[in-house]
């Protein structure tokens, strides 16, 4: 699921039992799917510390009663097997500025008919009777339905939009167990990244709001983990940070630490290039 095939991502035709393969970034649309520089910068940095991940984890006080955060793993919640119920949980931290990225781990076998990931305000509903794509059902939330490949916002009044946008009607994008959510409150956009491939902007117009990570689930005993990757402030990066990024780009990510250690540089500079001064 989500395997790279000749630079693309696997898609499945709904009208054919045979798997079909096509590039996720067609040549004519390639510019639309270029990963924004700030996202690239953030993903090049070391992931957030455990303490910061816990700060941005699921909120055990802001959830459906059919959900609980695990005692032995505060980054993961468990949903009770309650029939005819759709259940949500919000993250602890409401985001108003900066770029933020978090990883969702949601096993494909635990998604069921309605599995939605996105963001919401503090007023978005967290429970409904029956099965539905609850995230994105009102004006207070924005969600990506992983099974339907649809984006929903105020879906009671507005139809869902296909995402990734390049999918044809007879294709379904298989979202793997792990993927990234990128919320840029400075630009007011929400986007997703799968297998290091940026899938384009899912939602716009989010500036000026206070938004929380959220998922809605229907599968009994499903367990979903959220791991905060990190954030970037709105201010431009210092010149030293930009120089570090340029050097790391020139070296490349393969065996990066080994290559940096071989450079004829002072230890303090090697430490800086490897971000070891941060943790």
Swiss-Prot record:
Domain B30.2/SPRY residue range list: 36-233
Q: Report the subcellular localization.
A: Cytoplasm; Nucleus
Q: Which SMART domains match?
A: SOCS_box, SPRY
Q: Where is the SOCS box domain?
A: 234-279
User: What happens biologically when this protein's gene is inactivated, per the record?
Assistant: Homozygous females produce defective eggs, which desiccate and collapse soon after egg laying, or embryos, which hatch very rarely. Mutants exhibit wing morphology defects, including blistering, formation of ectopic vein material, and loss of material at the margin.
The record's listing under Gene3D superfamilies reads: 2.60.120.920, SOCS box
Tissue distribution of the protein: Expressed in ovaries, primarily in nurse cells and oocytes (at protein level).
Mutation: residue 131 to A; reported impact is: Does not affect binding to Elongin BC complex. Abolishes interaction with vas
Q: Which GO terms describe its biological process?
A: cuticle pattern formation; dorsal appendage formation; germ cell development; germ cell migration; intracellular signal transduction; oocyte anterior/posterior axis specification; pole plasm assembly; positive regulation of protein catabolic process
- Spell out the residue ranges making up region: Involved in binding to the Elongin BC complex: 236-279
Please give the GO cellular component terms listed in this UniProt entry. Answer: cell cortex; Cul5-RING ubiquitin ligase complex; cytoplasm; elongin complex; nucleus; perinuclear region of cytoplasm; pole plasm; SCF ubiquitin ligase complex
Effect of mutating residue 204 to S: Does not affect binding to Elongin BC complex or vas
Quote the function comment for this protein: Involved in the localization of vas to the posterior pole of the oocyte. Required maternally in the germ line for efficient primordial germ cell formation.
State the similarity comment: Belongs to the SPSB family.
- Protein name as it appears in the record: Protein gustavus
- The organism is Drosophila melanogaster
Q: Which gene encodes it?
A: gus
